[in-house]
Amino acid sequence: MSLNEPIKKVSIVIPVYNEQESLPALIDRTTAACKLLTQAYEIILVDDGSSDNSTELLTAAANDPDSHIIAILLNRNYGQHSAIMAGFNQVSGDLIITLDADLQNPPEEIPRLVHVAEEGYDVVGTVRANRQDSLFRKTASRMINMMIQRATGKSMGDYGCMLRAYRRHIVEAMLHCHERSTFIPILANTFARRTTEITVHHAEREFGNSKYSLMRLINLMYDLITCLTTTPLRLLSLVGSAIALLGFTFSVLLVALRLIFGPEWAGGGVFTLFAVLFMFIGAQFVGMGLLGEYIGRIYNDVRARPRYFVQKVVGAEQTENNQDVEK
């Protein structure tokens, strides 16, 4: 594929989960931004098992006769990245842009992403300027970004921002990957030859609350660790060797102290022994837990169950007809 292959159609993929308050503004602003493009476009909204009225709103928008919207309805909540992969499976564009539904990253940035991608980049990432999140979210994101950069060797400043553009061959390569734990920005960068980042505006969340709770962030961290690299397993071996050496050294020291100071001194060191023992046992349990995470991922992949189940697709035929009329 030529690096400067022209972009004839743009697909926007937006995962939606309980975003009924923001959906009207999201649809209006995204459509307005896409109308500024010189290319044909489609807007794919993936309902990730919402429990509010998001499903009804998406269905109504997709059924609009003048709509460029396709609504993909999943039967339950599978997570943000699985929902995006469901959208990827439906796209027909040469350039695919992902966007969150909370409007913290404005859809008005879409034309700029398309313009940068036309310069020949496989992936166009973004960095949130003046990020409007809590200190906890900022700190957690910074730590995750550092961990990803060390594991992948690719220096990108903000892996957590989902406002990104991907060439079609990158999306097709990702669709051939069937692992259950998928982090799309990292997966895309493993296939990309040319990547870049641009700074985008970041607004405060106007509607609802973030769907990433503390437990979801912890789960995301484990997903990243286990799907990126096997380095933690190697580190476990090193840590285990270090603990064994430390334990042997400490045992020799205790024997020497007993010989020097007599059995009375050894009786007073029982609590020290227990403290050291608990430290070693704790380290073993941490290692076993991490090893269990890897085994669990292998088990899920071996079962080869689908990432998601699409209950219904609304508006696909209508969107194709609208594109034909515009041509």
Curated annotation (Swiss-Prot):
Top-level enzyme category: transferase
Keywords for this protein: Antibiotic resistance, Cell inner membrane, Cell membrane, Glycosyltransferase, Lipid A biosynthesis, Lipid biosynthesis, Lipid metabolism, Lipopolysaccharide biosynthesis, Membrane, Transferase, Transmembrane, Transmembrane helix
GO molecular function: phosphotransferase activity, for other substituted phosphate groups; undecaprenyl-phosphate 4-deoxy-4-formamido-L-arabinose transferase activity
Subcellular location: Cell inner membrane
Catalysed reaction equations from the record: UDP-4-deoxy-4-formamido-beta-L-arabinose + di-trans,octa-cis-undecaprenyl phosphate = 4-deoxy-4-formamido-alpha-L-arabinopyranosyl di-trans,octa-cis-undecaprenyl phosphate + UDP
Protein's job: Catalyzes the transfer of 4-deoxy-4-formamido-L-arabinose from UDP to undecaprenyl phosphate. The modified arabinose is attached to lipid A and is required for resistance to polymyxin and cationic antimicrobial peptides. Not required for full virulence.
PANTHER family: UNDECAPRENYL-PHOSPHATE 4-DEOXY-4-FORMAMIDO-L-ARABINOSE TRANSFERASE, UNDECAPRENYL-PHOSPHATE 4-DEOXY-4-FORMAMIDO-L-ARABINOSE TRANSFERASE-RELATED
Protein name per the record: Undecaprenyl-phosphate 4-deoxy-4-formamido-L-arabinose transferase
Source organism of the structure: Yersinia pseudotuberculosis serotype I (strain IP32953)
Lineage of source species: Bacteria, Pseudomonadati, Pseudomonadota, Gammaproteobacteria, Enterobacterales
